[in-house]
Structure formats: structure tokens, C-alpha cells
Regions:
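Beta-lactam-recognizing serine transpeptidase/beta-lactamase-like catalytic domain environment
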Residues: 4-278, 330-353
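Short, highly charged C-terminal tails/helix-capping segments
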Residues: 310-334
């Protein structure tokens, strides 16, 4: 959920593209000794990410930046903003049994737990932990909305009945997501693209969390993909928060691996055509385990089914005419044209990242 928290922070003025924080590797509430550790650093570099802005916080998956941002945003802002992307709701057109997940709020906790909302609950929610949980279908839907720069495309199961195209009626229409500064959409897309495409920087000593795994994939990347790695909790990460070095869990208790992505990203002429959410049970690492699966699915759709030759499009303007004419859904001024979402709706989990 980090890209969505970041976009919400930009929209509501709690951060901007130039804001930099000093990340020591943990976050503390004012006057509280307890530390929320940076989960992504426990088995990585340790010691914090140092100076970090929102873009680096996304492509490096910096928990501490989002602890700070989420705390300042507050749960009311987080709840209302993430709800626009389908979290906590059934956004499908014809899947009545789809799980709604939980997008927690003060009212939800009081009603279900008979407890007040605490600041620590907000910090957990800022990285998709705590009481929040979502299905892969919700993650794919939210990712599609981000790819479409706010245009809501609701997923559906049924395409045709007895060979006749079927258009389900939208009984619960929702408004598109409106962002005051359109450049913030570009900024978030650029940040998610760096998750996949940013190589190691000698200057900043960092790289995109999925860069190495995607670079080792079987097929060379001929297009840009925007993505975000994550994990879904199976057991509590309290030990991680306390910076424990001796965590021993069975394979069945390992976190599930998650990766969301859409493509093509940052293309001058072709709008995003596909969004995916990959869920690998007990896979632990979203970037290295789920990331290559996401790329394989997107490769199959863009390169094999639509047969888009991105190399030709980059060098031959006339190639775009061939692509538009018969190999893919008609391109138009509607950013939702030809958009597809893919996901597995049967699993659920507490989403980390």
C-alpha cells in the first residue's frame, strides 16, 4: 500500500516530492520508548536508509518514511483516501462473493473490538499491517486505478453468455480518483518503475527492490514495468520490529510473497494494458519470488497475446499504426481503453507494503 499512502500524503499536503527525512532504521512516537523497526532492513543493510524522500522510500521500500508519513496523515485521512481505490470494498461488477477485506477506521475498531483507536494502530496501517487486510483482487484493482491515473476500471468475471458479449450493469458506480496536481501521478509511476528498473547506484548505494530479480528473468525486458513488492503476514512481525536476529519459523509460517505491477509504464504512446497482483504462498520475498512471476504474466500478455513489438515502436513510428489496427484494443483518449486486471481473489492476508 505504500504508493497509495504516498499519493495520499502528496494529495493532502503531508509531504511533497522534495521532502526528505532522516531514517535511522526505526520510528518512535513522541514520548514513547517503543520502536517500530524498518522491516525491510532486518535482513538487508541495517542502520536505516539515511536521507530518504518519497521516491526512494517507494523503490527501496522504506518502512520508516511511511511510519512517519502515516502518523502525520492520521487514520481518518488514510481510510478515506485508500477507500477510493477499492480497499475495504467489493469493487467487482459480477463477483458478489468477493471478499471486502478490512480497511480499518476508528468506527470499525470500536464496533468490532470495543476499543478506541491508538496512534500505534495508525503506524501499523501506514504499511498495510495491523488490522488492515486485502485480497490480491483488491490489490490488482487499486494498481489498475493508479495505472489509469485515477480512472476506475472495475474487474469482472464474465465476458460473454452463449457467445454473446456480456456487459454487467454497474449497480454501485464510484467516482474516479481526483488528484489536484496531475504530476503526482507521474511521480508515483516513476517511483514504482524504479522498483523494477533502477540499477545499483554507487553514489546513493541503493537500487530498486525488484531490479536484480527482474534482470535475471528469462526474457529480456523490452518495455518498462511499474511495480511494488510486498508481503502478507502469516505470523506477527513483533520480533522483526524489535530487531531480533534469531527468528525461526517453519515454512508454513513464512510470510506470503506479493508483487503488484502494471505495464507498459512511462510509454509515450501506449497506455498501460495490464495490471497484475501475484500472491505466492509462504514465498517470503515479494521482489525475488513474486516479481518474476508478474513479469512472466505481463510478458505473455503484451508480447505473446497482443504481440506488441516495443523495439519497433521505439524506432519506427509507423509500427504504432499496425499495433492500433489489429493487435490490441483500440487506443483512445480514454486512459482506461483496453485495460485489463488479473488477480487471484481466493487468498487474503495482511498486506505489508
Amino acid at each position: 500500500v505504500k504508493p497509495f499512502i504516498g499519493l495520499g500524503g502528496l494529495q493532502h499536503g503531508f509531504t511533497d516530492q522534495d521532502t526528505v527525512i532522516q531514517d535511522p532504521g526505526y520510528f518512535r512516537l513522541p514520548g514513547v520508548r517503543y520502536r517500530w523497526g524498518d522491516y525491510t532492513l532486518r535482513t538487508a543493510i541495517g542502520g536505516g536508509h539515511g536521507e530518504t524522500n518519497l521516491q526512494r522510500a517507494i523503490f527501496q521500500s522504506c518502512d520508516t518514511f511511511f511510519y512517519d508519513l502515516g502518523y502525520r496523515m492520521g487514520i481518518d485521512t488514510i481510510h478515506s483516501f485508500l477507500g477510493q481505490f477499492g480497499f475495504g470494498q467489493n469493487f467487482t461488477l459480477d463477483v458478489g462473493y468477493a471478499r471486502t477485506g478490512v480497511l480499518p477506521s476508528r468506527e470499525w475498531k470500536q464496533a468490532t473490538r470495543n476499543e478506541p483507536w491508538y496512534p500505534g494502530d495508525t503506524i501499523n496501517s501506514s504499511i498495510g499491517q495491523g488490522y488492515m487486510w486485502a485480497t490480491p483482487l483488491q490489490l490488482a484493482t487499486a494498481t489498475a486505478i493508479a495505472a489509469n491515473k485515477g480512472v476506475v476500471v472495475k474487474p469482472r468475471m464474465l465476458a460473454a453468455v452463449d457467445g454473446e458479449p456480456f456487459e454487467p450493469q454497474d449497480l454501485n458506480p464510484v467516482a474516479d480518483v481526483q488528484i489536484d496536481n496531475p504530476d503526482n501521478w507521474r511521480y508515483i509511476e516513476e517511483s514504482m518503475t524504479m522498483v523494477v528498473h533502477r540499477p545499483y547506484s554507487q553514489v546513493f548505494r541503493d537500487y530498486g527492490t525488484a531490479y536484480e530479480a527482474i534482470a535475471r528473468a528469462d526474457r529480456e525486458m523490452s518495455y518498462k514495468m511499474a511495480g511494488k513488492s510486498g508481503s502478507a503476514q502469516v505470523v506477527s512481525i513483533a520480533q522483526d520490529i524489535l530487531q531480533s536476529e534469531d527468528i525461526d519459523v517453519s515454512d508454513l509460517n513464512k510470510d506470503h510473497a506479493l508483487f503488484v505491477a502494471y505495464a507498459p509504464a512511462q510509454h509515450p504512446t501506449i497506455k498501460p494494458q495490464i495490471a497484475v497482483a501475484v500472491f505466492v504462498e509462504n514465498g517470503q520475498h515479494g521482489s525475488s519470488v513474486a516479481g518474476p512471476v508478474a513479469k512472466a504474466v505481463i510478458d505473455a500478455y503484451l508480447l505473446d497475446i497482443l504481440q506488441i513489438d516495443f523495439t519497433s515502436l521505439a524506432t519506427d513510428p509507423d509500427a504504432l499504426l499496425s499495433f492500433d489496427a489489429g493487435r490490441a484494443p483500440q487506443q483512445s483518449t480514454d486512459p482506461a481503453a483496453g485495460f485489463l486486471t488479473l488477480a487471484n481473489a481466493e487468498h487474503e492476508g495482511h498486506v505489508h507494503d
